[in-house]
Amino acid sequence: DGSWEDAKDDEFSVFSMPEAAERASIVFLLLPDEIAPDVYEEKIEPNLSAGDLLNFAHGYNVMYNFIEPRDDIDVTMIAPKMIGAAVRELYTENDGAPSILGVEQDATGNAKQRALALAKGIGSTRAGVIDGSFKTETVLDLLNEQFIAPVITTAMMTMFEVCRDEGYPPEAILLEMYLSKEYTHTFEKMAELGVVEQLELPSQTSQYGQLKGGNEFESPDIEEFMQDKYEELESGEFAKEWAVEQEMGYPVLNRLFEQYRESEFVQIEQRTIEAFGLGPDE
């Protein structure tokens, strides 16, 4: 993928995974969940030494036992609550992304101190480090993806369908909901000021409508959906299902992508993005 040459151009010493694992006393396993177990078993674990530290950025494979590290190494997690590119960008700005720290295995007696040093090394201690666990990070991360994201997407699709059926221009609906990026700004202000305090920024009409609507909205279906998702994660049911899906070649994932991409919502969305020049700069 070119990363080997990029690293050499940046004057890093570059080695194969087995050689890097053998040379290092601290190994960051920063690979996609789907491929990390095989890579660890074949290329990393045989080359680790007693007392080494194996660090993860996500707790998934350890929590669900797809990776079971040997007993004589420290196993830690520094999980920045930010995408990788932004972690680096914040670091160069003398800032940092907050992280969740977890210690799964403390073979040396110094695993937590070593993990904190790693957190400092990527800038996270400038922002804050939460003392958590692999389970804490995994369940909250997946709940955000499997509960919050579907609720938001379903709400937008519902508004689109209802307003379109009432005769409103589809393009105007999409721009109002998210294509204008107004909500990008709103979410930034939520993070900076708080969910309620950021309401001081829009008009009082908006303030009244949002707060009153929040009080009026009660849906046992959402609470039940949330509880179901939590239990799937807690029990390991989702992890087992996803493992089978990978083994079968992603038939359900591919079907779901096709289903959504063929929907009227996405078709009109893509045309609107193109028409208004809203896509990424080439």
Can you say where each PLM-predicted feature lies in the sequence?
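Rossmann-fold dinucleotide-binding core
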Residues: N55-E145
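Active-site-proximal catalytic alpha-helix in oxidoreductases
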Residues: G109-G123, G128-E166, E171-A191
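Glycine-rich, highly charged phosphate/nucleotide-binding loops
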Residues: D9-E19, M82-I83
